[in-house]
């Protein structure tokens, strides 16, 4: 996938919650996005010592052997909505996905696979409310990261606060 890091919102870039990742085969299953530290070695979503700045992650990614950069949600004000498999082979978008994107009204990008979307908002992830049908939500306390592409979808370039959409 072509690099679009310049489209990533500045607000997200300001947090030193970045790592790099690469696709690795795990025993015959579909390849998994394995996190790596920008300092070398494995990246851990629960260990800030393995994270770095946006610029460090981009430099590490460009140095080779990595497929992309990722943002860790731990200890941040952001919530990520991950909608998988909602784009059909003709480019059509599932109605539920289109509704979620519209309701969120925040920065949205194509996922690494090109078959789904990531939406990033400011807000708080409700307790126990992480998976809903075809989408999942991650935030502080979820020990997860997003592979960030910068391949923006739509015209919204900023991350907005939208607790109503998160709830």
Model-derived features with residue positions:
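Conserved phosphate/metal-binding and DNA-contacting active-site motifs used
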Residues: 1-167
